């Protein structure tokens, strides 16, 4: 409620809570009320008039003390009760200050929020109170105090729980208005249904003290496209205020178009503006619009897979061969924050901002950027409810070390011997220290308001042992510690539940975590064993979820693989009191058994109870009896040094798979860069199944990767070892093979990770992406094909530059025009004709201004000299007694002139046609056409008759197969002007 507090108590009108309709104006109606605590203690009761009622001894609703009350109102006609309504609500004040941010009950609060989709992982979109509560508890432990319900009206249970748990809510309604985002979305119904839907939405939710803002839309293109968006904004604002006239919450919008004038006009109507991924605009637009309240309605969009680490940390990596995203903190999409540190700290330095809402709290089903997989990677928590490393990062920023000290190490500790591992420590303490086997590695003082000093980072070579991180307070006292042990193969399973006893009401759920331990009892953090789960007694298995976005096995089955060492089993009790026995088993491991209890419900009304319906996915039968033992990890080692030189350019690398009894399968070997893109600096030669010979033939750093599919048909895990080649020499790229977008040699301006190993340009300013150097050869190419993913379905121009380096600006070749309707997350090829052929060794630069584009890569069409039009500039050698060479012709060709074209490869053809474009001022020029490969030759005669202008004439000739030199010989008596030649297949 947006209420007014007074020293004596709280003034509140019944109209704030209820609406009534009087169909009989002549009847004697009265409205009585009773305000009571949740345990039934009456605070005040009486008859309501049209004057405010003052409540005394009321405890306000707050995020730290979410005090709630019941209000019972009874409408009576002539003394007879005809309707009774009961609500649970709370009393609080809110204030949105344009300079100081958000105040709850006059206390400043920075919104530490997340965006949440509606699904519940393995439960899908089915609403369950205990599942939602579990999500909110996990979020609160992270430090979250606010949730944005993206992008639809939330389940009533969510708001009820937010009231009870003290979580602020931005209650959002629409993801589109009249302009659709997909074919069958709500835009089809907006004009007819929006008024009715707003009424039901506001009237249902307006008495929840947790709700502080009504969001009327998310990333609405109508607000950007034209001024009709302003009309809809006014209309929706009016509809909200019509049903919430007392301003219990205020209307707002979440926009990714705030750089545009039209969207700013819409924001000016609302005065509370949510920005999606636009922190760069805050300060200027705060200065330009001092009457606006500003906040980050959607931020972050870093992507991460729990327990997956793509090294090195210094390399920004979006996609990789395993279909996962790195949890090191180096995996970001091009529209989101550059890293977690920026996202967390930038908002802190803008006191006028209400706060921010990370995208997202939990992973959710669908929208799986940057891959076409099962669910998203954006969450700080996976779909199973297991925190990712990013969770602990935000916990380190959003929680207080004095009340909830914490520290967290990443990654797990199981890699190749000697491999350089980036180790990160997150803590909310002012100082952290890292130890390896009790030896101090280093200490770091941290400042949680400084982007570059918020994480403690170290790099060290891997060897077996234990990492320990210790957090210290400002006085040097230890307040928290975390450890990561090296581990061996899984030996047993372990079960743990969020609670061991629940009421037998058919609605409560128990969430059981299954993980694997080695023989010494240490967690096997990369375990992927297949686990079978059975539930006996008064319970049912409602679902299994491991949080793996790439795992398509059914949720509604009885077996799944562990992912990064964990699996969640969701248990649904029946209506009967008793015990539930949960058993987890895996081939070769000790079973784990857990006993749970269900207790009879007191005062149980069977009409109010129902048992959860559990439906088994038919696809689950395909895997229910599987007993495969997958490869957990691959250990790579080099027989001597990983530094290759001109004197020793090769070595042998070996692989050992774990566990030893894993299913036999081929190992896939590649030479790649850090992103997993194949690079041409070295080659691999197979010795046997587990040994490869590597030979380097160019300087540079590269990785040998060894991967397995574990029966899934795609890479599921890999191991890599870094090599450096020195003093061998440099090499140029092949322009006629596809060069992946991320393999650029230089860049200027804003650049980010593109989809599928591409490169993404910035939306503001000019971005230049340089590739090469390429060796185009003597004849070269004048055609380039570029796969492009353009996100707005608007035309865009690209500028192409030759020869740009760090010291040379290069030469502008031309501008290319791209205009194709966007297909989401899909590259579409466009071929561009260049005004000249690129030859020799040079670079190629793509330049884009003020547009976000994904460049998937590029490849050039190799022109076949033998079959291409050859102008006088393509002549390799000309000599003789008389001729005059200009830019476009050789004129006055006279006695004993020889014109040579080298590297003419006709393949297997020996009979062709030569087209000669020239001018013969005499009756006839006899041109001798000779083809020679140094061993054999052919000689042909072309009689070019009189012409007063340039004409093209065709002559059949014999040539040799393969590569050769073609010569035009002009004997004494010749008088000819030549513009060019061309050979044609017959």
PLM regions: where:
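A general structural signal for stabilizing positions within well-ordered secondary structure
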Residues: 60-63, 138, 205, 264, ...
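Structured loop/turn residues at beta-strand edges in well-structured enzyme cores
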Residues: 64, 109, 142, 209, ...
């Amino acid at each position: 409620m947006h209420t007014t507090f007074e020293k004596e108590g709280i003034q509140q009108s019944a109209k704030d809570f209820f609406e009534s309709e009087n169909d009989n104006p002549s009847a004697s109606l009265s409205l009585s009320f009773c305000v009571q605590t949740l345990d039934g203690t009456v605070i005040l009761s009486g008859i309501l008039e049209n004057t405010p009622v003052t409540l005394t001894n009321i405890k306000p609703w707050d995020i730290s003390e979410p005090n709630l009350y019941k209000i019972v109102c009874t409408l009576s006609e002539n003394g007879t009760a005809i309707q009774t309504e009961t609500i649970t609500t709370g009393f609080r004040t809110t204030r949105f200050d344009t300079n100081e941010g958000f105040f709850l009950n006059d206390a400043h609060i920075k919104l530490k929020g997340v965006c949440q989709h509606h699904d519940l992982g393995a439960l899908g979109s089915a609403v369950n109170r205990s599942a939602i509560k579990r999500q909110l508890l996990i979020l609160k432990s992270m430090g979250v105090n606010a949730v944005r319900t993206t992008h639809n009206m939330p389940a009533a249970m969510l708001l009820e729980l937010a009231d009870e748990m003290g979580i602020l809510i931005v209650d959002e309604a629409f993801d589109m208005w009249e302009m659709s985002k997909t074919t069958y979305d709500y835009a089809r119904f907006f004009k007819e249904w929006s008024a009715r839907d707003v009424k039901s939405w506001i009237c249902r939710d307006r008495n929840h003290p947790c709700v502080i803002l009504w969001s009327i839309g998310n990333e609405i293109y109508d607000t950007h496209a034209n001024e009709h968006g302003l009309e809809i904004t006014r209309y929706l604002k009016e509809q909200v205020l019509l049903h919430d006239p007392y301003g219990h919450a205020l209307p707002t919008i979440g926009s990714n178009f705030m750089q545009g004038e039209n969207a700013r006009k819409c924001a000016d109507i609302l005065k509370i503006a949510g920005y999606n991924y636009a922190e760069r605009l805050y300060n200027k637009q705060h200065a330009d619009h001092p009457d606006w309240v500003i906040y980050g309605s959607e931020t972050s969009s870093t992507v991460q897979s729990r327990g997956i680490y793509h090294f090195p940390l210094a390399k920004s990596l979006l996609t990789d061969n395993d279909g996962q995203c790195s949890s090191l903190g180096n995996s970001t999409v091009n529209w989101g924050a550059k890293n977690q540190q920026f996202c967390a700290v930038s908002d802190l330095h803008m006191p006028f901002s209400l706060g921010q809402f990370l995208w997202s709290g939990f992973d959710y089903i669908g929208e799986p950027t940057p891959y076409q997989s099962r669910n998203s990677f954006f969450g700080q928590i996976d779909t199973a409810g297991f925190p990712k490393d990013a969770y602990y990062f935000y916990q380190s920023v959003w929680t207080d070390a004095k009340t909830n000290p914490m520290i967290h190490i990443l990654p797990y500790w199981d890699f190749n011997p000697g491999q350089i591992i980036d180790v990160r420590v997150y803590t909310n303490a002012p100082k952290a220290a890292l130890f390896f086997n009790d030896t101090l590695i280093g200490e770091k003082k941290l400042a949680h308001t400084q982007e570059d000093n918020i994480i403690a980072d170290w790099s060290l070579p891997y060897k077996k042992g234990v990492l320990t991180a210790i957090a210290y307070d400002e006085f040097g006292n230890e307040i928290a510690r975390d450890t990561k042990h090296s581990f061996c193969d899984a030996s047993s399973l372990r079960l743990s539940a969020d609670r061991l006893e629940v009421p037998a009401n058919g609605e409560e759920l128990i969430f059981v975590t299954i993980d694997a331990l080695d023989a010494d009892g240490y967690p096997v953090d990369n375990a992927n064993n297949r686990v079978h789960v059975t539930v006996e007694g008064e319970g049912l298995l409602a679902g299994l979820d491991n949080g793996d976005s790439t795992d398509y096995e059914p949720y509604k089955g009885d077996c799944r693989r562990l992912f990064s060492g964990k699996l969640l089993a969701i248990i649904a009790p029946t209506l009967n009191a008793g015990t539930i026995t949960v058993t987890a088993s895996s081939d070769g491991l000790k079973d784990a058994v857990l006993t749970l209890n269900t207790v009879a419900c007191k005062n149980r009304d069977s009409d109010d109870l129902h048992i959860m319906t559990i439906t088994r996915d038919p696809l689950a039968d395909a895997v229910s009896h599987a007993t495969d033992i997958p490869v957990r990890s691959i250990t790579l080692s080099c027989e001597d040094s990983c530094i290759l030189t001109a004197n020793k350019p090769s070595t042998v690398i070996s692989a050992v798979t774990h566990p030893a009894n894993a299913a036999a399968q081929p190992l896939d070997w590649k030479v790649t860069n850090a992103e997993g893109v194949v690079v041409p600096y070295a080659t691999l030669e197979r010795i046997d199944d587990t040994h490869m010979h590597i030979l380097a033939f160019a300087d540079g750093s590269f990785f040998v990767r060894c991967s397995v599919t574990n029966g899934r048909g795609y890479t599921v895990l890999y191991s890599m070892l870094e090599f450096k080649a020195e003093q061998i020499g440099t090499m140029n790229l092949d322009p006629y093979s596809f060069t992946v977008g991320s393999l650029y040699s230089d860049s200027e301006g804003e650049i980010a990770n593109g989809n599928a190993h591409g490169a993404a340009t910035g939306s503001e300013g000019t971005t230049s992406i340089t590739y090469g150097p390429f060796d185009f050869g003597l004849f070269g190419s004048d055609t380039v094909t570029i796969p492009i993913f353009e996100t707005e379905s608007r035309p865009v121009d690209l500028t192409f530059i030759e020869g740009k380096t760090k010291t040379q600006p290069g030469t502008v070749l031309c501008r290319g025009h791209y205009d194709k309707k966007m297909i989401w997350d899909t590259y579409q090829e466009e071929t561009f004709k260049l005004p000249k052929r690129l030859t020799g060794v040079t670079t190629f630069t793509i330049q884009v201004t003020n547009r976000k584009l994904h460049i998937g890569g590029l490849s050039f069409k190799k022109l076949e000299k033998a079959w291409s039009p050859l102008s006088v500039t393509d002549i390799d050698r000309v000599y003789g007694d008389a001729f005059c060479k200009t830019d476009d012709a050789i004129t006055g060709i006279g006695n004993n002139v020889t014109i040579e074209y080298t590297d003419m490869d006709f393949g297997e053809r020996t009979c062709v046609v030569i087209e000669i474009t020239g001018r013969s001022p005499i009756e006839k020029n006899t041109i001798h056409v000779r083809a020679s490969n140094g061993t054999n030759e052919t000689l042909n005669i072309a009689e070019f008759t009189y012409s007063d202008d340039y004409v093209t004439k065709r002559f059949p000739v014999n040539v040799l197969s393969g590569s050769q030199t073609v010569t035009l010989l002009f004997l004494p008596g010749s008088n000819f002007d030549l513009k060019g030649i061309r050979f044609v297949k017959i």
